[in-house]
Amino acid sequence: MRIVLLGPPGAGKGTQAQKLAEKLGIPQISTGDLFRYNISNGTELGLEAKKYLDAGDLVPATLTNALVDDRLDDEDAAAGFILDGYPRSVEQAKALDEMLKKRDLSLDAVLEFRVPEEELVSRLKGRGRDDDTEDVIRNRFRVYRDETAPLLDYYSADLKTVDAVGELDEVFARALKALGR
């Protein structure tokens, strides 16, 4: 299966992606992990990304797209994958479509993990990170709504909504059900 996970910060995408990857026997592909791997291994793309990250800038979409494109060529992704944190914009979604098209593939599912904003604020404040102030958290939601919400329309034909409030295993069961598993 080829799956994209969407949802705001604190919705549990990373945790659920890990559980789904384990259950389905396919890799979880996170852009954060891709950046760290390529930087620590000194790849050309990693060194390029490091320049932006060291300067505190966002890595350009073209570079992120190239990292994802390379990762999709890895043998473990041949049977499927779970994309966690990518795409973040319609532009990246279109780039992903092209990556899949050149491999004669398509997405099987797009899951949106939905949690009320007040619950997300509570979750994120509970993590105890210094930078997780309420203002910072609410700004992250605004950025998510502005940039990622259009993806919900873009993927409307394949989109399945998962209620991500509740115990980890309850949310996992809902995600599996949304995937028809």
Curated annotation (Swiss-Prot):
Enzyme Commission number(s) from the entry: 2.7.4.3
GO cellular component: cytoplasm
A molecular-function term among this protein's GO annotations: adenylate kinase activity
Keyword Cytoplasm tagged: yes
Annotated keywords: ATP-binding, Cytoplasm, Kinase, Nucleotide biosynthesis, Nucleotide-binding, Transferase
Reaction catalysis annotation: AMP + ATP = 2 ADP
GO biological process terms held by the UniProt record: AMP salvage
Associated pathway: Purine metabolism; AMP biosynthesis via salvage pathway; AMP from ADP: step 1/1
Residues reported in the UniProt entry to bind ATP: G10, A11, G12, K13, G14, T15, R127, G166
Entry similarity comment: Belongs to the adenylate kinase family.
Domain notes: Consists of three domains, a large central CORE domain and two small peripheral domains, NMPbind and LID, which undergo movements during catalysis. The LID domain closes over the site of phosphoryl transfer upon ATP binding. Assembling and dissambling the active center during each catalytic cycle provides an effective means to prevent ATP hydrolysis.
Protein name as it appears in the record: Adenylate kinase
